[in-house]
Amino acid sequence: MLIALNGFGRIGRTVLRTYLQRLDDISKIPIVAINDVADPKTLLHLLNFDSTHGSLAKIGMSADIENTDGVFVLRICRKNQIAKIFLLNEPDPQKLPWKVFKINIVLECTGHFRSYKKANLHLKAGAKQVIIGAAPFDYVDACVVMGVNDNVLSKKLPIISGVSCTTQALVPLLFTLDHVFGLNSVLMTEIHATTADQMVLDQAHRDLRRARAAGHNMIPTTSSSIKATLQVMPHLDGKINGYSIRVPTINVACIDITVTFDRYVTLDELKTQLKTASQTSLKSIMAYNELPLVSSDFIGDTHSLVVDDEYIMQAGTAFKIMAWYDNEVGYANRLLDMCNKLNNCL
């Protein structure tokens, strides 16, 4: 399996960093090329020094760049191991050398090529498959949530969406509840750290709320996770709604859902089912926390979600459930899980 990253922003860099940490020998990393419109010097600096996850040096690695006649290669070192990855600077995906590199999977992490037509440009350039690292703008061959419907993954699907970090957190929770109790209604509030789509100071934006200063406001806005959830659980159409509140932190989000069920459920029964799922069918996807933690405690957590036991509560027939997730590391791990599962498909 050979992988290319298109886009080396927050998600692209976290994907690389995560893959490096997974490997016993980083020289065997299957990521062979990274494309981004930023200059190599800037990309190198942002990889080496990360405000959220710390420097590469703190995890025993260092990075530099080789420039041979204008061909840039990112070198990452860990002890006596060296990973080498081509750095490209091509704004048009159709012109990327995916055929030359024999790329199997492009992880599309720019946030810009989220329509089928634009993602298809990678296929025209010679890649076998594309995983869009975001909720799609229109249709794709499959929207995949690990732990729920990843059984649909196949090398016959040209364009796949990894939906969003919030969808990867929300759907396993809803799937578990629906399977055991039957969901009657779901209202979700996504409390999300600031993203690159927001403004540092008040400035023009298509969303007038996101136009306001990110570090100075709690900003209500839409959440793509509702539409994406319906791609995986279409029978919830008309039963689910929700929105996002962006808050001035740099990482980790939580979902706060209020649900009603098709049958009578007790609080103890609900907690038991979620805890059991976290230890069995969703062991690497969902964790269950019983400690009094706050958002920064979940930085670096590899799960899609961590259910907070203390904030599962009941009022009448309605239940409230809160779950945390590292919106960068958790999501990066799911994208890599998709790549590995595709690699093992016949």
Annotate each predicted stretch with a short phrase:
Residues 1-200, 204-211, 337-338, 345:
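N-terminal Rossmann-like NAD(P) cofactor-binding subdomain of oxidoreductases
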Residues 8, 12, 115, 163-166, ...:
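Generic structural signal for well-ordered, non-membrane alpha-helical segments
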Residues 16-17, 120, 171-178, 189, ...:
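Predominant activation on well-ordered alpha-helical scaffold segments within soluble catalytic domains
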Residues 37-39, 136-137, 164-166, 190-197, ...:
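Glycine-rich beta-alpha junction loops
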Residues 152-154, 210, 247-253, 313-316:
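Short, flexible turn/loop "capping" segments at secondary-structure junctions
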Residues 156-157, 213-215, 252-256, 318-320:
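Short, solvent-exposed beta-strand edge segments and adjacent coil->beta transition regions
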Residues 179, 183-250:
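Acidic, glycine-rich segments within the central catalytic cores of soluble metabolic enzymes
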Residues 242, 254, 258-346:
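C-terminal active-site/capping subdomain that shapes the small-molecule cofactor and substrate pocket
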